[in-house]
Swiss-Prot record:
This is Peptide deformylase. The active site is at E150. Removes the formyl group from the N-terminal Met of newly synthesized proteins. Requires at least a dipeptide for an efficient rate of reaction. N-terminal L-methionine is a prerequisite for activity but the enzyme has broad specificity at other positions. Gene3D superfamilies: Peptide deformylase. Pfam families: Pep_deformylase (PF01327). It comes from Neorickettsia sennetsu (strain ATCC VR-367 / Miyayama) (Ehrlichia sennetsu). It catalyses: N-terminal N-formyl-L-methionyl-[peptide] + H2O = N-terminal L-methionyl-[peptide] + formate. GO terms for molecular function: metal ion binding; peptide deformylase activity. Transmembrane segments: none annotated. It comes from the Bacteria. Its cofactor is Fe(2+). Fe cation binds at C107, H149, H153. The gene is def.
Length: 186
């Protein structure tokens, strides 16, 4: 396995819509493993392919068991709230909970920043797994939040797009300053 280079905002690639994956080859599975290793190395709980420079509809997620939720979501029977790793190829959310909850989010592509984002507390997602099998996952809590966050990336959106224009613009400006500071340090 190999570590992949992380794309940091501002970068136009992060605002592109990712393309569907035609099929799962052994080469694609190596890429999935590399994504997961990169996510772990960077301390994340989710990663989208576009964040490592590949415009394909792929995300990996691994939410630690027992990760605290910052509010009291409904307990959805039959839904998973943590666990993994999950490999989502061509994921599609087919159902959103009507219950919206706030929680602080961060992003590997916007380092050193966290903002409160309001999202549905549960989703049902259809996807292909690591073996190319079609699956359906009912997720709530941090798992649902992470899936939604990563799927925003596949649609060319960053989580800060859920903020007011003022907060969004400040977050992007701060990201540019952080990226510049990190590149000067290298």
């Amino acid at each position: 396995m190999a570590l992949l280079a992380l794309i940091i905002e501002p970068d136009p690639l992060l605002h592109e819509v990712s393309e569907a994956v035609a099929g799962l080859s052994d080469e694609k599975r190596v890429f999935l493993d590399d994504m997961l290793e990169t996510m772990y190395h960077c301390g994340g709980i989710g990663l989208a392919a576009v964040q490592v420079g590949v415009l394909e509809r792929i995300i990996v997620v691994d939410v630690p068991v027992g990760k605290e939720w910052h509010s009291s979501p409904l307990n959805h029977v039959g839904y998973k709230s943590s666990g993994g790793p999950y490999y989502f190829v061509n994921p599609e959310i087919i159902e959103f909970s009507q219950n919206l909850v706030p929680a602080d989010e961060g992003c590997l592509s916007l380092p050193e920043q966290h903002y409160e984002i309001i999202r549905p507390d549960a989703v049902v997602v259809k996807y292909l797994n690591y073996d190319g099998e079609e699956c359906l996952l009912k997720a709530n809590g941090w798992l649902a939040r992470c899936i939604q966050h990563e799927m925003d990336h596949l649609n060319g959106r960053l989580y800060v797009s859920h903020l007011s224009k003022l907060k969004h613009d400040l977050a992007i400006k701060k990201a540019a300053e952080i990226k510049k500071r990190h590149s000067e340090a290298d």
